[in-house]
C-alpha cells in the first residue's frame, strides 16, 4: 500500500466535502463505488490515482479522525496563520492543512517532516508553488 497515494485520496475527499458540503461518511461510502470503478473525478491537470495501491483503511482512519477533531484541527491552523483568516484559504489549501495537521497531532508513527513534505508535494500538485511555500510556513510553526 502506498501512503502518498492514500494521502492524496484523503485530501481529495476532504476537498470534495469542503466544496459541496457532503459529509465525510457519505464521501467514504462513495469511495467504495469509486474504487470499484477505478476512477476519481478528473479535473484539469489532475492525474488519476490508481486506487489498487491505496490503503483504504488508512484513508478512512484519517477522514474519520479529521471529522472527529475538526474544531481542534481548525483552531490549530488558525493559531498558526499570519495575517490570514481560515475562511479566506482556498478549499484545496484548507484540505491539505487539515490533513497534515491531523497527522502531526494524532499520527505519532509518521515523522513530522514526512507529513509536512507530503503536504508540500500535494500543494505543488493541486494548488501551486506559492501555496506550497505558504503551507510549509504554517505547518512549520506547528512543530
UniProtKB/Swiss-Prot annotation:
Q: Which SUPFAM superfamilies match?
A: NusB-like (SSF48013)
GO MF terms held by the record: RNA binding
Give the range the annotation lists for the signal sequence. none
**What keywords are assigned to this protein?**
RNA-binding, Transcription, Transcription antitermination, Transcription regulation
GO biological process: one example = DNA-templated transcription termination
An example of a Gene Ontology cellular component annotation for this protein is: cytosol
Enumerate the NCBIfam families for this protein: nusB
Q: What does the UniProt record say this protein does?
A: Involved in transcription antitermination. Required for transcription of ribosomal RNA (rRNA) genes. Binds specifically to the boxA antiterminator sequence of the ribosomal RNA (rrn) operons.
Family that this chain belongs to: Belongs to the NusB family.
* Protein's UniProt name: Transcription antitermination protein NusB
| Species whose genome carries this gene | Clostridium botulinum (strain Kyoto / Type A2)
Organism ancestry: Bacteria, Bacillati, Bacillota, Clostridia, Eubacteriales
